[in-house]
Amino acid sequence: MTNFTHINKQGNAKMVDVSNKEITKRVAEAHSSIIVNEKIYSQITQNTNSKGNVLNTAQIAGIMAAKNTSTIIPMCHPLPLTGIDISFKWDSNNDDSYRLNITAVVSTTGKTGVEMEALTAASVTALTIYDMTKAIDKGMIIGETYLESKSGGKSGDFHRKN
């Protein structure tokens, strides 16, 4: 049976003590996506949304989310993040819908990883796009959110195999 590090001997939640862990460079990349209709695609790419620039706002929201991960996920450590980069790439689904792929890369030099920060950034970026465009279509689909890769730390590197 696996021992869960976030559970104490009494079975209660605890935050893992990382004080004895080695300080290393840590980077995590997470992905998410949102499928939108042609009207939303045009509004985003032509920057005509009445609420403002959708992608810039979503990037800022994703960055803020990464910085605040420890305040919304109980056992995450507050970390001094050294970099957060959120990027976008459009794909056409050839059926009058468009997929916006979201990549969030988060880095730090510290004693614990930034996987949760990257996943939170990617998720909140997609949620912000939904929020800013839902007046046009509430049928948007937020796609799979997953860790693509991580490096640094005792557990070593991880790269998703497709």
Swiss-Prot record:
| GO MF term list | cyclic pyranopterin monophosphate synthase activity
**Where is coiled-coil annotated?**
none
Q: Which SUPFAM superfamilies match?
A: Molybdenum cofactor biosynthesis protein C, MoaC
InterPro entries with a match to the protein in the record: MoaC (IPR023045), MoaC_bact/euk (IPR047594), MoaC_sf (IPR036522), MoCo_biosynth_MoaA/MoaC (IPR050105), Mopterin_CF_biosynth-C_dom (IPR002820)
Q: Part of which pathway?
A: Cofactor biosynthesis; molybdopterin biosynthesis
Instruction: Give one GO biological process term.
Output: Mo-molybdopterin cofactor biosynthetic process
Residues forming the catalytic site: 131
Q: Name one Pfam family in it.
A: MoaC
What is the enzyme's main class?
Answer: lyase
Annotated function? Catalyzes the conversion of (8S)-3',8-cyclo-7,8-dihydroguanosine 5'-triphosphate to cyclic pyranopterin monophosphate (cPMP).
Question: What family, per the record?
Answer: Belongs to the MoaC family.
Query: What do we know about how this protein assembles, alone or with others?
Result: Homohexamer; trimer of dimers.
Q: What is this protein called?
A: Cyclic pyranopterin monophosphate synthase
Q: Which gene encodes it?
A: moaC
